[in-house]
Amino acid sequence: MSDSNPSQSNNRRSTTVNRLSAENVTLGYDQRVIASELSAEIPDNSFTVIVGPNACGKSTLLRALSRMLKPSTGRVLLDGQAIQSMPAKKVARTLGLLPQSSIAPDGITVGDLVSRGRYPHQGLLRQWSRDDERIVQESMASTGVAELADRFVDELSGGQRQRVWIAMALAQQTPLLLLDEPTTFLDIQHQIDVLDLCAELHEEQGRTLVAVLHDLNHAARYATHLIALRGGEVIAEGAPGDIVTADLVERLFGMKCQVIDDPETGTPLVVPAARKARKVPARDAEAPAKTVARAAS
């Protein structure tokens, strides 16, 4: 496995025209530039994951791709059009977003929140319909929250709430779905549940997903396409099996490691190098017996 040449990564673009891309965008907040002349393409029908160290521009790029952040230079293209010039409802019918921090209104039920995903499809001549109700019910069923429809969102666990937000995004019925750190604040079981759900949406429904993840091993296991950012620059992109190497991990995070095959999936698995060799204390002859006794008690 070998990662991309950093000098070629930003300039090398596929000849295929994909639905969502950023072209030479400069991104930042106020006067602080996060990324300069950054280009990235999201392959159609992929599960693309953006990875990199803290403050490298992952969420900033996702915000630009979702029309939440306007580039100071360059442009984001959605279906060949500059996304900033498109009507908000038109974008919302094509692209759904699950932000990093989602806050539900007080006193709202799961069913009501998921129903809000149908808002982009409403208008003066098109009000709530049986089709809308069917889509909401299907979205809740596919995310495993149908039985929670009458529960208040603020009563749910973190994992349940995240599934509800994904259900709302599904109710938009967009071919593109962007998720900013969807596993943040979740325990390991709920992280895997959410990522399994994302994989199902990609594989079974054919949606194009773009997610920001901190865990490189999760990214390598679930993504079909990785974009590796450092300092606002794409330093590698491609299939996890092609680019995730010990050299790439050291360049991204400054961390030495081994990259082995995941015994469950065969995808790359990053094993960090131990900073210090641990000394195993010598055991006396009675130690095994004491250990067994504690385990049995």
Predicted region positions:
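Conserved ABC transporter NBD signature motif
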Residues: 74-82, 91
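Conserved ABC ATPase "signature" region
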Residues: 115, 130-148
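Helix-to-loop junction immediately C-terminal to a conserved catalytic motif
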Residues: 66
